């Protein structure tokens, strides 16, 4: 992993010498898969003006190496060796999220075999810069239909296009009745929203194996949208989020809600 971090830095150093060919004040970084992991490291460099991390988002030692799924019941972690902890704190990309300098876009599939869907949100909780994310349901290493976000992100932050980027709202869960849950979102710029689609999933801690179902969405007319959906076990996790499409074709998703109905 060290070499993967080192190589793009060498490329960046060379790129900054090409002053006759490019505007070196407008350099962005796009990383796909393992390149997504690298994007977090590159985003601590002041010469990078914005980043896109596609799929990769760290936490490899947790979910991929040790099958430590965030929503296991009960949750437990194995003892990490000193070597594990050194790797986690220096080469796992979540270690760099809190030092980010530039806007970061995370493009993801909910069931991705490389990126970790559930833990990826943590990177955006600790980052000091603007971030955004969107993900395709029931897919792995596929963002078909979402690609325009990448172009528009670079248009906004490199070209300076007058694009207002919507925020990622929280997904607020509630219980309608025993066996029926509801999720509600409050999108930014609600007058520009053209579509909202809710997804929900039940029980499965392994995000790669999770099945996402669509739920009928209701526009509440007050700037919020909601959906109701069934669950069968109030002691197990329920997951929900909304995919929000805007008139300028930007798609963002709400932050995933993961909740145990009996605890609400």
Model regions: which residues?
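Alpha/beta-hydrolase fold nucleophile elbow
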Residues: 21-33
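Short beta-strand elements
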Residues: 249-264
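The feature captures the conserved acid-bearing segment of alpha/beta-hydrolase catalytic domains
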Residues: 63-125
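Surface beta-strand/loop "capping" patches
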Residues: 152-200, 206, 213-232
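Short, aromatic- and glycine-rich surface loops/edge beta-strands on solvent-exposed regions
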Residues: 235-248
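Alpha/beta-hydrolase active-site loop
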Residues: 1-20
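Hydrolase active-site cap/lid region
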Residues: 38-81, 134-137, 142-148
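Short beta-strand immediately N-terminal to the catalytic nucleophile in serine-hydrolase-like folds
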Residues: 29-31, 54, 107
């Amino acid at each position: 992993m060290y070499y993967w971090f080192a190589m793009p830095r060498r490329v960046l150093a060379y790129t900054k010498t090409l002053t006759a060919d490019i505007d070196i004040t407008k350099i962005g970084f796009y990383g796909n898969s393992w390149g997504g992991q690298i994007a977090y490291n590159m985003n601590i460099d002041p010469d990078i003006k914005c980043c896109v991390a596609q799929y990769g988002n760290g936490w490899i030692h947790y979910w991929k190496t040790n099958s430590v799924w965030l929503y296991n019941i009960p949750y437990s972690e194995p003892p990490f060796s000193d070597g594990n902890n050194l790797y986690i704190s220096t080469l796992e990309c979540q270690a760099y999220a809190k030092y980010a300098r530039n806007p970061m876009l995370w493009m993801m599939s909910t069931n991705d075999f490389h990126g970790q869907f559930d833990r990826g949100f943590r990177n955006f909780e600790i980052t000091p810069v603007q971030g955004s994310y969107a993900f395709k349901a029931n897919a792995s290493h596929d963002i078909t239909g979402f690609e325009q976000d990448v172009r528009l992100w670079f248009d906004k932050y490199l070209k300076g296009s007058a694009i207002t980027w919507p925020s990622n709202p929280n997904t607020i869960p509630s219980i309608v009745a025993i066996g029926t849950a509801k999720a509600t979102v409050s999108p930014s710029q609600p007058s520009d929203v053209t579509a909202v689609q809710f997804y929900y999933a039940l029980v499965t801690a392994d995000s790669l194996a999770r099945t996402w179902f669509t739920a009928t969405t209701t526009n509440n007319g007050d700037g919020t949208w909601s959906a109701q959906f069934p669950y069968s076990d109030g002691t197990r996790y329920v997951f929900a989020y909304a995919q929000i499409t805007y008139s300028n074709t930007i798609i963002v998703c709400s932050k995933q809600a993961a909740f145990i109905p009996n605890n609400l």
